[in-house]
């Protein structure tokens, strides 16, 4: 039966992603978790395959495909069950690259977006602070303009890709309000501390301190004081990517469950023969199917329109 949302090309793309993940991700997940780091070589391969530039214009090295390719990609990331790896990719593409693509100058796009699409530079987004969480109004990190530079002071915490990434899209307070700066991780005065975690260890999570970090004014994303608006627009894509990854993760968990209850025996037969478990599995599968249709519909509409706050918020 023909899909309402996907074409044959989308299906072929899904098949190629599955094959790539089976060859390049699944065999290495345990090692990455043990090492607390995703091998950069796989990220570079993903860049070479065009996976980081699905919705990026061709002039910046992307392939500029419709939004359903984006949806398919993040659903399949979730289905890998490699949630640390998935966090690295989502943080790079959706949290960091997306802001540069939407609000960056031509200079910033050439300097950061192009190598990000190629997988040779990996980005992070820094919003959360130690005493404010993600409460943007309570943000304490500041950027004071002095001539052709901003002087940045403050700290961020729980930043995905914050330790091993190459640049950090940072939200901070300027004289005119909340602004966004692209800051190189190797900048003088910037230090990162990797946090130890119980799970999802292959995704590096960091505390970041800014001590009189000097950032060129040219690294400002969009207009000074307009950062909140940029974040509200970009958060829609972030939430949708997170929801699609979660749906893929649910399918992964359901597949594991089906395999387990087919093998596990009790009272002389596989436990998948017990009606109470069959009902529960059917209920879970129905919930997943309903959420998928809702998210596919939201993705399809978001690809046609610029703002769908209500639908995207419901997806979370």
Regions found by a protein language model. Give the residues of each.
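Short Ser/Thr-interspersed hydrophobic loop/turn segments at strand-loop and sheet-helix junctions
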Residues: 50, 73-78, 172-175, 182-187, ...
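A short, Trp-centered hydrophobic/proline-enriched beta-strand micro-motif
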Residues: 119-127
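Alpha-helical interface subdomain recognition
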Residues: 1-83, 90, 103-108, 115-120, ...
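A short core secondary-structure module
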Residues: 149, 153-193
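Flexible, small-/acidic-enriched active-site or ligand-binding loops
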Residues: 138, 186-216
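Long, acidic (Asp/Glu-rich), low-complexity accessory segments flanking structured domains
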Residues: 212-230
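Helix-loop "lid/cap" segments that line or gate small-molecule binding pockets
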Residues: 93-103
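Short Gly/Pro-enriched turn/cap motifs at secondary-structure boundaries
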Residues: 116, 131-134, 158-161, 173, ...
């Amino acid at each position: 039966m023909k899909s309402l949302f996907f074409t044959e090309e989308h299906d072929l793309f899904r098949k190629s992603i599955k094959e790539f993940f089976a060859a390049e991700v699944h065999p290495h997940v345990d090692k990455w978790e043990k090492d607390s780091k995703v091998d950069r070589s796989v990220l570079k391969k993903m860049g070479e395959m065009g996976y980081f530039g699905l919705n990026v214009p061709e002039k910046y090295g992307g392939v500029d495909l419709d939004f359903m390719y984006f949806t398919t990609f993040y659903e399949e990331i979730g289905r890998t069950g490699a949630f640390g790896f998935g966090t690295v990719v989502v943080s790079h593409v959706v949290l960091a690259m997306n802001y540069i693509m939407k609000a960056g100058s031509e200079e910033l796009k050439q300097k950061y977006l192009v190598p990000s699409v190629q997988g040779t530079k990996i980005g992070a987004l820094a919003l959360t602070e130690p005493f404010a969480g993600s409460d943007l109004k309570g943000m304490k990190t500041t950027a004071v303009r002095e001539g052709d530079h901003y002087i940045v002071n403050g700290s961020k915490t729980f930043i995905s890709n914050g330790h091993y990434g190459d640049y950090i899209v940072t939200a901070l307070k300027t004289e005119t309000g909340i602004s966004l700066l692209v800051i190189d991780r190797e900048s003088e005065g910037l230090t990162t501390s990797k946090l130890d975690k119980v799970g999802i260890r292959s995704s590096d999570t960091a505390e970041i301190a800014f001590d009189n970090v000097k950032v060129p004014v040219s690294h400002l994303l969009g207009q000074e004081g307009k950062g909140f608006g940029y974040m509200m627009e970009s958060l829609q894509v972030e939430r949708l990517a997170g929801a699609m990854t979660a749906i893929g993760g649910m399918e992964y968990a359901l597949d594991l469950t089906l395999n387990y209850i087919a093998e596990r025996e009790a009272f002389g037969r596989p436990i998948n023969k017990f009606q109470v478990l069959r009902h529960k599995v059917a209920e879970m599968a129905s919930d997943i199917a309903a959420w998928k249709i809702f998210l596919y519909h939201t993705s399809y509409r978001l690809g046609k329109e610029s703002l769908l706050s209500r639908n995207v918020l419901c997806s979370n």
